Amino acid sequence: MITRKASLILTILSLLAGNALAESIEDLPGVAAHVARAQEIAGDEFGFIASGLLCGPAEETIARAIRTVPGFLVPDAPGIEPMAFFDNLYYVGMYAWGTFVLDTGEGLILIDSLTNEREVEEILLPGMAELGLDPDDLTHVIVTHAHVDHYGGAAYIKETFDVPIIMSELDWQDLAHDISYPYFVRAGYPEVVQPVRDERDHVVEDGEVLEQGNSRVTFYVTPGHTQGALSMFIEVQDGGETRTVALWGGSALRTEVKELSQMHNSLHRFWEIGRELNAEAVISTHAWLVGNFKQHERGRVDGKNPIVIGAGGFDRIMGIYDECMHAQFARNRAAD
């Protein structure tokens, strides 16, 4: 019979063995070389990306985020001060995740929707009011992918403001298999209301363009993070100039070989399109992950928007993603 003390000792030994294995895998040349290359591409400007969650072991992402990202999987996490990234593109949300509001001059497009009614009522709507944006002007809710922190508030927004929800067909289907849902349940979130799959408001197609007012959003289905993750290029206004901003629809890497391979293929396609479109910025509704908060805090220097990193900056961030994915491929091979 195993005593409770013996059981605890076995558990500790198992954890230590697991940590030792993880550390030994990280030291393997195939892993370390790709992480080092990601850090080389990043330099000082983007070093936080290469040394953060993105390039670490994918199986540890959630646990590390809980430890290091303020408000991650905290049901009553507060909102942060809403901020303008561009003249007509605003971040509203918490630190861990948020939304973008695109003011097209002919209505507002919302990108992602927080997790539930509470976050919409207590964070999104007051944040929009602070920016002088009227939720009655919302025309669309774009859901980048079928995880709770992106779709959770969409059904409530649709019902309250009569706004259609935009998702890819694959992610409308994938709602039933959302791998993030159990994490939110275990963390104590109130019931999450999913968009009704049989009432697909708008099924967006790969390459589809949404033109409205002074803005243009071009969608690409980029499977990997989820089967139907939506990435997009958004035309925004910046001091009288029109700029193209890249939004990669799902950042955290998957451990499964199939999904990771899909994500890698999707990245290279998105990367090439971004080069053709001269993408000059990379944003995320997990804004901390790509450094948007750090950029915004710097403020304008000589009138230059700190979110704008130029075509070279876009290229470097895509290169960091690429090397981090190769590092995860190497981890997977080592663990087999």
Question: What residues fall within each predicted segment?
Answer:
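Active-site neighborhood of phospho(di)ester-bond hydrolases with catalytic His/Asp-centered motifs
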Residues: I111-S113, L138-A146, I166-S168, V221-G224, ...
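Accessory terminal helices/loops
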Residues: I12, L16, E23-F72, G239-T242, ...
